[in-house]
């Protein structure tokens, strides 16, 4: 479930994932990890909604969104992979079965017990409850613990058809984490990120409705 594709000394443990790779063998490609809810029936979903920007999680109190050409190229990689798996992207999240959320971490953060997603709820304006609907956040039906540094992407595929309410949480059906060293070239960084996105889907053959 793991593959070497830009690496920032990452310690990442996913339940049901394979043994951590030998860091001596890592190159400048992204290190990609993926995980999913084994009970999810992805063939039951047809449409997905993905924002037109990448959430940047950093040191600022205000929400920051990455929307430039590089961000659009990375988001297009997600869209292409989702479309190739038989999912249809829609412009209105109210019409979507799934929500695809991409976040970028530009500062060093350490998280233990990722099973509690409250880690970003204190950031005003981030992908909070009003954005996805009237619900109390979301949850992971599997255990995850990891730390990561600058140059990391976290992607979550949410089940928007799950029961919503003040206490109910939307389940995360699939998540990918990729991290890598950043070069001084924007084009190189973007290229490596796109390769990482493609690898995340390549190692997630179950993520399809075909």
Spans of features found by a protein language model:
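C-terminal motif of bacterial Sec signal peptides marking the signal peptidase cleavage site
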Residues: 13-16
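Low-complexity, compositionally biased segments in intrinsically disordered regions
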Residues: 98-153
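Extracellular/periplasmic catalytic domains that process cell-envelope and extracellular macromolecules
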Residues: 41-43, 92-94, 146-150
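Positively charged n-region of N-terminal signal peptides that target proteins for export
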Residues: 1-4
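Start-of-domain marker
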Residues: 18-47, 55-71
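N-terminal segment of the mature soluble domain
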Residues: 53-104
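Structural recognition of the beta-strand scaffold that forms the well-ordered cores
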Residues: 47-50, 99-102, 154-155, 172-175
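C-terminal/domain-edge helix-coil "capping" segments
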Residues: 18-21, 29-39, 148-172, 178-210
């Amino acid at each position: 479930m793991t593959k070497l594709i830009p690496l920032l000394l990452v310690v990442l443990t996913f339940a049901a994932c394979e043994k951590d790779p030998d860091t001596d063998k890592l190159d400048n490609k992204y290190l990609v990890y993926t995980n999913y809810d084994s009970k999810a029936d992805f063939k039951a979903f047809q449409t997905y909604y993905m924002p037109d920007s990448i959430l940047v999680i950093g040191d600022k109190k205000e929400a920051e969104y990455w929307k430039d050409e590089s961000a659009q190229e990375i988001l297009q990689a997600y869209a292409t992979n989702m479309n190739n798996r038989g999912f249809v992207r829609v412009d209105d999240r109210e019409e979507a079965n799934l929500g695809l959320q991409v976040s970028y971490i530009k500062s060093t953060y350490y998280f233990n017990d990722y099973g509690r997603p409250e880690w970003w709820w204190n950031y005003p304006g981030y992908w909070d409850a009003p954005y996805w609907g009237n619900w109390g956040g979301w949850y992971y039906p599997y255990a995850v613990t990891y730390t990561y540094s600058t140059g990391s992407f976290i992607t979550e595929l949410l089940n928007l058809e799950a029961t919503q309410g003040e206490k109910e949480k939307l389940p995360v059906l699939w998540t990918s984490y990729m991290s890598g060293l950043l070069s001084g070239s924007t084009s190189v960084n973007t290229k490596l990120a796109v390769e990482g996105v493609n690898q995340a889907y390549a190692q997630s053959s179950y993520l399809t409705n075909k």
